Amino acid sequence: MAGTKEIRTKIKSVQNTRKITKAMEMVAASKMRKAQERMRSARPYAEKVRNIAAHLATANPEFKHPFMQEREVKRVGMIVVTTDKGLCGGLNTNVLRAVTNELKTLQGRGVDVQATAIGTKGMQFLGRVGAKVISHVVHLGDTPHLEKLIGAIKVQLDAFTNGEVDAVYLAYTKFINTMKQEPMVEQLLPLAADKLVQTEEEKRAYSWDYIYEPDAQTVVEELLVRYVEALVYQAVAENMASEQSARMVAMKAASDNAKNVIGELQLVYNKTRQAAITKELSEIVSGAAAV
């Protein structure tokens, strides 16, 4: 059995670790609230752009944007959104497992895949599995900015427009609530008509039209690009909210475990100290009896 000095050292070490995890838990909780607010703030913009794009697409059926043209799928682009840092539980593991399953399915059908990595963990994963990475962006920080994402996203959008890929998928972690985050792999392009016009009521509402300057086609082309960019930004915002929630939960679990370990070590320390005192008393009594 370890001596009291060694046990005290272990207790001190675990206490120091608990201070770190507790501080990280509090920081993650603060960042989580900001990330959730950022995520909620991004939704109205994406929804408004969708409404306008849907109105244009419905009122002008003669024009079909390249983003809405379906082709036989032989090549696929995949945008993989992960975190830059670890210590967030199984968040990255879960979304990368979903990506792995999707890659196996696509490759099993003879489909070539080229990827875009958003986040260091995804970049490292794609490098390990030997995936073809055509663009990437890392170190986004706690506040993602669309201008930093656009370059990497545009590579995939241009590849789709030019016919280099026939579909683009988006993999990220969807924020459900503080305790639950769900890995998602969704088709980003081509845009399905029912994704723009989601209800019959919307379809009827969009049957009338505006007068556009310079023309409807130019407006649609610009709006759909902005809409797809907004979808990717929303996915990044959701992923960041999920990251901070998962990190807060993971650090709380680590702090609770450290507290339990400290309690167990304290019990062992007390027993060891009691045994040492009992032994000393026995030796004193034995010595006195011998005299």
UniProtKB/Swiss-Prot annotation:
Organism source for this protein?
Cupriavidus necator (strain ATCC 17699 / DSM 428 / KCTC 22496 / NCIMB 10442 / H16 / Stanier 337)
Q: Does the keyword Membrane apply?
A: yes
The name of this protein is ATP synthase gamma chain
Q: Which function does this protein serve?
A: Produces ATP from ADP in the presence of a proton gradient across the membrane. The gamma chain is believed to be important in regulating ATPase activity and the flow of protons through the CF(0) complex.
Where is this protein primarily located?
A: membrane
Q: Name one GO biological process term.
A: proton motive force-driven plasma membrane ATP synthesis
Q: Which HAMAP family match?
A: ATP_synth_gamma_bact (MF_00815)
For this protein, the record's NCBIfam families field holds:
ATPsyn_F1gamma, PRK05621.1-1
User: Per the record, GO CC terms?
Assistant: plasma membrane; proton-transporting ATP synthase complex
Q: Which CDD domains match?
A: F1-ATPase_gamma
Q: Where does the UniProt annotation locate this protein?
A: Cell inner membrane
Tell me which family the UniProt entry assigns to this protein. Answer: Belongs to the ATPase gamma chain family.
A family per Pfam? ATP-synt
The protein's matches in Gene3D superfamilies, at most eight in alphabetical order, are given as: 3.40.1380.10, ATP synthase, gamma subunit, helix hairpin domain
How this chain sits in the membrane, per its record, is:
Peripheral membrane protein
* Record-linked PROSITE patterns: ATPASE_GAMMA
Q: Which domain of life is it from?
A: Bacteria
According to the record's subunit comment, the protein's assembly and interactions are: F-type ATPases have 2 components, CF(1) - the catalytic core - and CF(0) - the membrane proton channel. CF(1) has five subunits: alpha(3), beta(3), gamma(1), delta(1), epsilon(1). CF(0) has three main subunits: a, b and c.
GO MF annotations for this entry?
ATP binding; proton-transporting ATP synthase activity, rotational mechanism
Which UniProt keywords are given for this protein, alphabetically ordered? ATP synthesis, Cell inner membrane, Cell membrane, CF(1), Hydrogen ion transport, Ion transport, Membrane, Transport
